[in-house]
Amino acid sequence: MSAAMGRPFLKMNGLGNDFVVVETRSAPFEPTAAQVRAIADRATGIGCDQLIAVDPAEGADAHVRFWNADGEEVGACGNGTRCVGWLLMQSSGKDEAVIETRAGRLVATRAGERLVSVDMGPPRLEWNEIPLAEPHDTRALDVVLYHHADLMAPPGCVSMGNPHVVFFVPDAEQAPAAEAGPAIEGHPLFPEHVNVGFAQVKAPDRIRLRVWERGAGLTKACGTGACAAMVAASRRGLIGRHATMELDGGELFVEWRADGHVIMTGPAAVDFQGELP
């Protein structure tokens, strides 16, 4: 792994959704898909859900790139953005960090001790913005994606810079996430594949959520998934404009503001540091 050899990294997590974070100021970082998979491998590598590169940027605090554990570069990662935002604010001493991503510009702000809010921007709700392979109503998708009693109600589709489909289920703990997730992820309706959420509305301001993450599998938390589920539920009238999202790794607070922007608030943590092999 010569392109990465000896490069320092930080291992971070947001509610157990974990990342290997490298900064590229000292040397370019262009890992191959095989190198990403080797770093992410929990048996033989460092182990992570996503690899993150923090690049210098004109007019922003950083440009950030994300790779899923399968080696594919992706446009957005909510928990990862929150962790990078915390790092940038610690470095600058400021209470705000402007972050450029492939999916657009995001702004992180301090929300408390190791708590960070990220303005994820407005959700994309048109079928061709998700994207879907053909026109459908993204509020309630009229397609059976997986045959299971709990998954027959029409799911919602939202893009938060990456594609999500959200099923509303009677019991998130019993939802067939590990079985249905990989089958739906690669469904031909989703040309870029899709993240799959299983959401149980517990109260008008509380949702229990499990997420099968595209290219990573079941994760303890998915920030963009939490945003997508909250928006999908609000569009259906199941909740209002804000909710506490209960994920396997803990809680995120998500608000869909009147100006259309989605704000996600949650913790960021540093686990350890080291050097890439």
UniProtKB/Swiss-Prot annotation:
Its main location: cytoplasm. It catalyses: (2S,6S)-2,6-diaminopimelate = meso-2,6-diaminopimelate. The active site is at 77 (proton donor), 222 (proton acceptor). One of its GO terms (cellular component) is cytosol. Pathway: Amino-acid biosynthesis; L-lysine biosynthesis via DAP pathway; DL-2,6-diaminopimelate from LL-2,6-diaminopimelate: step 1/1. The record marks 164, 213 as: Could be important to modulate the pK values of the two catalytic cysteine residues. GO terms for molecular function: diaminopimelate epimerase activity. InterPro entries: DAP_epimerase_AS, DAP_epimerase_DapF. Pfam families: DAP_epimerase. Keywords: Amino-acid biosynthesis, Cytoplasm, Isomerase, Lysine biosynthesis. Its EC number is 5.1.1.7. Substrate binds at residues 17, 50, 68, 78-79, 162, 195, 213-214, 223-224. It is found in: Cytoplasm. One of its GO terms (biological process) is lysine biosynthetic process via diaminopimelate. HAMAP family: DAP_epimerase. NCBIfam families: DapF (TIGR00652). Homodimer. Catalyzes the stereoinversion of LL-2,6-diaminopimelate (L,L-DAP) to meso-diaminopimelate (meso-DAP), a precursor of L-lysine and an essential component of the bacterial peptidoglycan. Belongs to the diaminopimelate epimerase family. This is Diaminopimelate epimerase. The gene is dapF.
